[in-house]
Regions:
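N-terminal small-domain helix-loop-helix segment of the aminotransferase-like
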Residues: 1-84, 91
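Short acidic capping loops at alpha-helix termini that bridge into adjacent secondary structure
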Residues: 75-79, 100-102, 149
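Aromatic/hydrophobic pocket-lining residues that form π-stacking "cages" and hydrophobic walls in ligand
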Residues: 91, 113, 174
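Conserved PLP-anchoring active-site segment centered on the Schiff-base-forming lysine
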Residues: 95-117
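A short helix->loop->beta-strand "cap" motif at the edges of active sites that frequently abuts
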Residues: 101, 122, 180-183
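Active-site phosphate-binding strand-loop segment of PLP-dependent enzymes
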Residues: 131-197
Length: 199
């Protein structure tokens, strides 16, 4: 597997820490560890008492239990913790797709959403966001993109880079669409809070 160079990361490597004004990053405003711990009284004791060894491969049980509370109908044993989006995308493609498969990816988008699959030999079709529609993608176009080889639909909500966020109704229709066509749905929700509270 030979992925294409990650253009955004190459750009950041050159400019992220030297630009006078950085307007192209999605990082939140940073804070110190003491500022973070101040959100929960007594948490410094918990941090200082934390064990730094290996944990179970799906992630620390306490973390998985806490993550499960964020989603309706998801048990903690159905959660696998990753170190970031790159690892999760790679794991999904490696485990769920084969070189003869086809994936539909909401575009424009985060490069890894399509380039990792392409590096594995998966054929990728763009499901294009339309500026004139507020960056929503056309549902009829999605239907037309499905082939007998299609195995996955990849979306990002809120969408990167446009910021489009589907209504609950639209999101539910996308969720229902995937199993109706025998597809895995990979929904990258790296930016769900606070903007996605309505879902």
């Amino acid at each position: 597997m030979q992925p294409t160079p990650f253009k955004l990361e190459r750009y950041f490597a050159q400019h992220e820490f030297t630009a006078r004004h950085l307007l192209c990053s999605s990082d939140p405003e940073s804070m110190s560890i003491s500022e973070l711990l101040a959100f929960e009284p007594g948490s410094i004791d918990g941090l200082c008492g934390s064990w730094l060894g290996y944990t179970e491969y799906p992630g620390a049980p306490a973390l998985r239990r806490e993550l499960a509370t964020l989603y309706d109908g998801i048990r903690d044993d159905a959660i696998i913790v990753h170190t970031g989006a790159q690892e999760a995308i790679y794991s999904f493609v490696n485990a769920m797709l084969a070189p003869s498969d086809h994936a539909i990816v909401h575009m424009p988008g985060y490069q890894s959403h399509y380039s990792v699959a392409e590096a594995f030999g998966v054929k990728v079709s763009p499901w294009k966001a339309r500026e004139e529609a507020g960056w929503a993608a056309d549902r009829d176009e999605l239907e037309a993109l499905v082939t007998p080889a299609t195995r996955a639909l990849v979306i990002c909500a809120p969408h990167n880079p446009t910021g489009w966020l589907p209504s609950r109704d639209v999101f539910d229709r996308i969720v229902a669409f995937a199993p109706r066509h025998g597809l895995w749905l990979f929904s990258d929700e790296v930016y769900p809070r606070p903007g996605a509270r309505s879902r």
